[in-house]
């Protein structure tokens, strides 16, 4: 939810979808209609029945921003937000990432270019790794990107979650399908390179597979 006092065409929203599309839309595109109390307005046109919105970001200024996308099969792509054109609320946007067969965009981050940005990756096998996104070369929109997980022939890792790490300290509370809760402190992890698959935080055969997470203050330990 993004509150506002008045709509401003200089402010905008960035939408990132599962099927590999991205767009920017001015805030004024979302002026409430007469039926706003009973009927939701369209924010983006999805390309397929399987498509869904993976991330939304509010951009309040005209500073330089970068986009980082992570695919389910472990590809990462970084490029400038200026490569994404501004379009209306009814549009689907432009291609964000060149996806392999059976792959999809799992999540995306949008952050100020001058900002030091890290990300925490959690795989379906409950492995955790931290990466510094400034180590990625800024390339172009709609490319495939680089692998950020080492591919294994047997039981390969797949990205379940990507969490942007800000200067504010927090804990990641990871929940499994057997209702086991594990706390992860991003500060406990050193920055890894692209070919590292991270370290396991639990045994999925015993504790279940990761299904969701929430963030809490750094002092709210279990």
Regions found by a protein language model. Name each.
Residues 1-222:
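Short, structured "edge-of-domain" segments at secondary-structure transitions
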